[in-house]
């Protein structure tokens, strides 16, 4: 019969002693060159896509509304006229969706003109004004709402018949750069227009967006409270820094307090479930009486629900107690590594601020993609066509509508009333426009790949810095002078390709998840339960795969930073090393997660509570210089402070988490490479040596001196 395979051999042989190894390898060569070349070629293509988008794109159509002639409001010749006025906005309301009108103004079959301000009062052309001139009725009364170029001596009735001037005005507010009537405004006597039309067509838009009022109030609140928000973020920064640095003193007691707290919460849950189960059992409330129902809250009134919860919590409590009893040695090792990580961060304080570099690089990646996508979406040559408000009028039958025209040469003295050369849209017949979808896909792939590469760069750089701390035998004397900058230069010089390789693998999985989410969203209403179940299984599998790849990449980058091998070899060595110490991996991972979760909760919760009491004016007696500002939305600076505190805490604790993972891999390598002899001394701290019951041999001369 075959021999039983040794579990250690199944996951590779332990690392061998190397007398020349003294931490991160200095003499290394470039790794994954093919992937490096591919990444640089892709980046060059990404830059080319951006240049093409910049040449052909026109994002002004998104930022500024257009009038009937295609000219932008708010820039150029209309610089002092930032708002768009519809002569009869209710033709838009009655023919199309108001949101579509807000996005594509010329979908409305009515003339549109740029104005310096929206009308403030209701007005309509009186019967006795029809015989007067445009100059008398409009220009003299400061109603500059006619189309450009309308002469002042033109009769009003002619300007109205040709739709060169509006027949009525309503008090309006600017929203999305366009003048929208107030929902409760008084409507003049115009056919097919009533208060109901306004309420149905305008109220929804203004109530949901209320763009101008809300944006102004938000701006005012930020102007009043920005320095207090910065103060709150400063508090978050100090709390995060103190928490990381004090872990060397309180990591052990804090971890045990947290573990006891979790056990206590589970114990209370068991007690509560038992009380509920006993009461319902005495009442005879059983699931057999309830039967099957889709009302999930009804199941809380039957004894079986509480019995199942009781059993589940009891099992979890038992598992945690057994782990605490039998894995206490490994928990002590995890705590010692956390304390060592705190010392490492204290020795290299610059690592705490490296997330700022990552943040700036991520901001560049996202901003470049957003601008490229915007320019691509607005690429194409503008197209102008002939248009008239009423093609059934006499004289319009001879005009070929929707034919191309020049907006700089508007039709003059045409037999067709209101004939204009208007902007219709952008041509989609060019090479760029035909390839628009493919270019956008290229941009999305570039976004994912560059973001994952930037994150990988940060992990590898931090791993190189912290590895140099662990493998310094005499700390801090043997630590390099600039460990972070040295690791940064070393990573960029030799391992750009390896980082790109790992980032590409993760990107492909994330793209697959995004496609699956898109398909699920599109087919959600038409799927049967079986298809929904299959889709859910696929999504779950891809989610698990993404988590595993992130975990594997993270440890592969640590091995790359230390040994300078390519991505595949580093990933294999890291995986084998972790599998040979799987129990220690699980314990350290969970203890670290628990500690960092508590740290984030402490920082974010503390800043949130402090901000709430300050901005709601509940902290009294601090003097005039510390009075809370008067705000429209007091929750706005509170939420901003909380989100900022979370970002700051995540940045600090991501560095700490990377430090723990790096020191852990170095610790495992140290155990396999060395034995504590004079030739092969351990590099780990004295606390870890004491926990493991190991020690380094001391030269005979040092022993005599100690005596």
Curated annotation (Swiss-Prot):
It catalyses: choline(out) + n H(+)(in) = choline(in) + n H(+)(out); thiamine diphosphate(out) = thiamine diphosphate(in). It holds the Pfam family Choline_transpo. It is found in: Membrane; Apical cell membrane. Keywords: Antiport, Cell membrane, Glycoprotein, Membrane, Transmembrane, Transmembrane helix, Transport. GO terms for molecular function: antiporter activity; choline transmembrane transporter activity; thiamine pyrophosphate transmembrane transporter activity. Residues 54-226, 271-306, 377-452, 520-557, 616-635 are extracellular. One of its GO terms (biological process) is positive regulation of cell growth. The chain crosses the membrane at residues 33-53, 227-247, 250-270, 307-327, 356-376, 453-473, 499-519, 558-578, 595-615, 636-656. Glycans are attached at residues 67, 142, 184, 195, 295, 390, 402, 413. One of its GO terms (cellular component) is plasma membrane. It is a multi-pass membrane protein. Coiled coil: none annotated. Residues 1-32, 248-249, 328-355, 474-498, 579-594, 657-707 are cytoplasmic. Choline transporter that plays a role in the choline-acetylcholine system and is required to the efferent innervation of hair cells in the olivocochlear bundle for the maintenance of physiological function of outer hair cells and the protection of hair cells from acoustic injury. Also described as a thiamine pyrophosphate transporter in colon, may mediate the absorption of microbiota-generated thiamine pyrophosphate and contribute to host thiamine (vitamin B1) homeostasis. Belongs to the CTL (choline transporter-like) family. This is Choline transporter-like protein 4. The lineage of its organism: Eukaryota, Metazoa, Chordata, Craniata, Vertebrata. The gene is SLC44A4.
């Amino acid at each position: 019969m075959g021999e039983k395979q040794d579990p250690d051999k199944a996951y590779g042989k332990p690392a061998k002693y190397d007398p020349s190894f003294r931490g991160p390898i200095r003499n290394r060569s470039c790794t994954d060159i093919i992937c490096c070349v591919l990444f640089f070629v892709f980046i060059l293509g990404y830059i080319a896509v951006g240049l093409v988008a910049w040449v052909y794109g026109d994002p002004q159509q998104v930022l500024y509304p257009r009038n009937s002639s295609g000219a932008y409001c708010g820039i150029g010749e209309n610089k002092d006229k930032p708002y768009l006025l519809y002569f009869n906005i209710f033709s838009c309301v009655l023919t199309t969706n108001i949101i579509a009108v807000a996005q594509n103004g010329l979908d409305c079959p009515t003339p549109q003109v740029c104005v310096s301000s929206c009308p403030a009062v209701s007005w309509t052309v009186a019967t006795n004004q029809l015989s007067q001139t445009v100059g008398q009725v409009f220009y003299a009364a400061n109603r500059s709402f006619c189309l450009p170029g309308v002469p002042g001596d033109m009769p009003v009735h002619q300007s109205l018949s040709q739709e060169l001037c509006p027949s009525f005005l309503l008090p309006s507010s600017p929203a999305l750069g366009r003048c929208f009537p107030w929902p409760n405004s008084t409507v003049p006597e115009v056919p097919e227009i009533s208060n109901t039309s306004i309420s149905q067509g305008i109220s929804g838009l203004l109530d949901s967006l209320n763009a101008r009022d809300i944006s102004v109030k938000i701006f005012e609140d930020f102007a009043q409270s920005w320095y207090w928000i910065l103060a709150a973020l400063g508090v978050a920064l100090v709390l995060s820094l103190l928490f990381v640095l004090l872990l060397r003193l309180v990591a052990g007691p804090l971890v045990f307090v947290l573990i006891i707290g979790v056990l206590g919460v589970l114990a209370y849950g068991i007690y509560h479930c038992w009380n509920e189960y006993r009461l319902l059992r005495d009442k005879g409330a059983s699931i057999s009486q309830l039967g099957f129902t889709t009302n999930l809250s009804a199941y809380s009134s039957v004894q079986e629900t509480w019995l199942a919860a009781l059993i589940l919590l009891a099992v979890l409590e038992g598992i945690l107690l057994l782990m605490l009893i039998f894995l206490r040695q490994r928990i002590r090792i995890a705590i010692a590594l956390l304390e060592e990580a705190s010392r490492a961060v204290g020795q290299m304080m610059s690592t705490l601020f490296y997330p700022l570099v990552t943040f700036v690089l991520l901001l560049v990646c996202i901003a470049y993609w957003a601008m490229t996508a915007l320019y691509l979406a607005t690429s194409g040559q503008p197209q102008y066509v002939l248009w008239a408000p009423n093609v059934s009028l006499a004289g319009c039958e001879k005009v070929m509508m929707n034919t191309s025209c020049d907006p700089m040469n508007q039709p003059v003295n045409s037999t067709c009333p209101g004939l204009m050369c208007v902007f219709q849209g952008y041509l989609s017949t060019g090479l760029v426009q035909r390839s628009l979808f493919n270019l956008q896909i290229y941009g999305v792939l570039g976004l994912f790949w560059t973001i994952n590469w930037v994150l990988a760069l940060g992990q590898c750089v931090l791993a190189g810095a912290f590895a140099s701390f662990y493998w310094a035998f005499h700390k801090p004397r043997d630590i390099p002078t600039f460990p972070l900058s040295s690791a940064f230069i070393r990573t960029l010089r030799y391992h750009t390709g390896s980082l790109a390789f790992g980032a590409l693998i993760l990107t492909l999985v994330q793209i697959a998840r995004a496609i699956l989410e898109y398909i699920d969203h599109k087919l959600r209403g038409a799927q049967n339960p079986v298809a929904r179940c299959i889709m859910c299984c696929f999504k779950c599998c891809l989610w698990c795969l993404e988590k595993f790849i992130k975990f594997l990449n993270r440890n592969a980058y640590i091995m790359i930073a230390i040994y300078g091998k390519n991505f595949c070899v580093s990933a294999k060595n890291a995986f084998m090393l972790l599998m040979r110490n799987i129990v220690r991996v699980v314990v350290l991972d969970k203890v670290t997660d628990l500690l960092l979760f508590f740290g984030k909760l402490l920082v974010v919760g503390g800043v949130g509570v402090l901000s709430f009491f300050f901005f709601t004016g509940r902290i009294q007696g601090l003097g005039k210089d510390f009075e809370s500002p008067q705000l429209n939305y007091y929750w706005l600076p509170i939420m901003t402070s909380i989100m900022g505190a979370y970002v700051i805490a995540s940045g600090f604790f991501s560095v700490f988490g990377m430090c723990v993972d790096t020191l852990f891999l170095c610790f495992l390598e140290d155990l396999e490479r060395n034995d504590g002899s004079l030739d092969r001394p351990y590099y780990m701290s004295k606390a870890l040596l004491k926990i493991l019951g190991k020690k380094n041999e001391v030269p005979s001369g040092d022993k005599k001196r100690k005596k």
